């Protein structure tokens, strides 16, 4: 008896089915009190902003996945906006005896490729991950980060 209402609520709570509700969303434009603040403590490994900026500059402000990718001009550099990405994420530092914050591990990516690596589906990421591994494996080894392709893939998924 209540299953239709419950199913609609579950879809709503999961954010599904909003694509066709655009014109009806104004119904939910109401005042909402400010939520209480909460403290979040997060331990992260230090990253060198110098390594990141020099990696982007040494790539000529071009995406290392596809140099034809274009982006907007960044106001602080006057150059195409690019992002530094650790191929092996810094959160994995505990698994390695040498620092992951090295030039060989920081790649210059356009925002789209960067978001693909963080939020994309595996099938779309595969070729990008392969390219990164083959482009960087030798340089990583020189930095004391010796890693096979299978291990690399498993760590960054």
What is the meaning of each model-derived region?
Residues 25-79, 91-101, 152-156:
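Short, charged surface segments at domain edges that flank catalytic/cofactor-binding sites
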